[in-house]
Amino acid sequence: MQKTISIILVTILAITAGHVANARERGKVTNLPIPRYVSMKAEEGNVRRGPSLSHRIDWVFKRRNMPLQVTGEHGHWRRVQDRDGQGGWVHYSLLSGARHVIVERDLTPLRTKPGADAEVNAYAEAGVVARLGSCELDWCRVTADGKKGWVQKAALWGVLPEELRD
């Protein structure tokens, strides 16, 4: 009987540990997942060394809709980084939950449906910022400069590899 109970407890612990390992960290302010992606709401945003106006401005993000990855939270401030890993603290009012991505590969095809054999609508150059739509396992629907299509997720920065969107 003791052995059976021990086996059951070990099994429960193993299952629970797996779920805890898969759980993503949550922000202490918003309770939203960390990391997560947001975009620049403003045309410009000061990037500071720390989470307050008294901290030095290290640089300025100057691209509206640019996707950024949130890696931390403190009060009204979000620690973010861009696709090059550069970042710092930005006031939350300069950020939007509207999702955008950056095309990473030059002449990336926008296809009529998910799949490498689907017809090509248009091509996007590397560095193009696109509005993110739905995502399947390996493909995401995007809109860039009025052109819509499906792009391989691996060609985009601003979406998690396991992320699915309706």
Segment roles from a protein language model:
Residues 1-7:
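Positively charged n-region of N-terminal signal peptides that target proteins for export
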Residues 7-16:
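Bacterial N-terminal signal peptides
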Residues 15-23:
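Polybasic, low-complexity, intrinsically disordered segments
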Residues 22-49, 60-64, 71-74, 78-86, ...:
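SH3-family beta-barrel domains
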Residues 52:
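Intrinsically disordered, low-complexity polar regions and short flexible loop motifs
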Residues 56-57:
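Beta-strand-rich domains and repeat architectures in extracellular enzymes and scaffolds
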